[in-house]
Amino acid sequence: MMRVLIVTAVFTFFLVLTSSGHDEDNEQRNILEGMFLDRAIETPKGLEEKRACGILHDNCVYVPAQNPCCRGLQCRYGKCLVQVGR
């Protein structure tokens, strides 16, 4: 509940700053946008993190002696698929 109130207050403050048309205010708005807007929009944790290996049906490029797919999977037909014989 407290998090919602903080996000609402920051968003309201951001709207007040963006409503004015002065050049100095535009500079302040750009700074605040970089600081607060990213925090107000929540994304699932780790969404943008790159995985070390491909999961089932991820795209992959086959390179001999390297397996870009996670354990138990292999790169076939440009996708990470279950290993043959499993």
Swiss-Prot record:
Molecular function as annotated in GO: toxin activity
Tissue specificity: Expressed by the venom gland.
Chain positions with Valine amide modification: V84
Keyword Coiled coil: no
Top-level taxon: Eukaryota
GO CC aspect terms: extracellular region
Signal peptide extent: 1-21
Propeptide: 22-49
Subcellular location: Secreted
Keyword Secreted: yes
Cysteine pairs bridged by disulfides in the record: C53-C70, C60-C75, C69-C80
Keyword tags: Amidation, Cleavage on pair of basic residues, Disulfide bond, Knottin, Secreted, Signal, Toxin
Function text: Possesses strong antiplasmodial activity against the intra-erythrocyte stage of P.falciparum in vitro. IC(50) for inhibiting P.falciparum growth is 1.59 uM. Interacts with infected and healthy erythrocytes. Does not lyse erythrocytes, is not cytotoxic to nucleated mammalian cells, and does not inhibit neuromuscular function. Has neither antibacterial nor antifungal activity.
Family listed: Belongs to the neurotoxin 10 (Hwtx-1) family.
UniProt note: domains: The presence of a 'disulfide through disulfide knot' structurally defines this protein as a knottin.
Protein name according to UniProt: U1-theraphotoxin-Pc1a
Source species of the chain: Psalmopoeus cambridgei
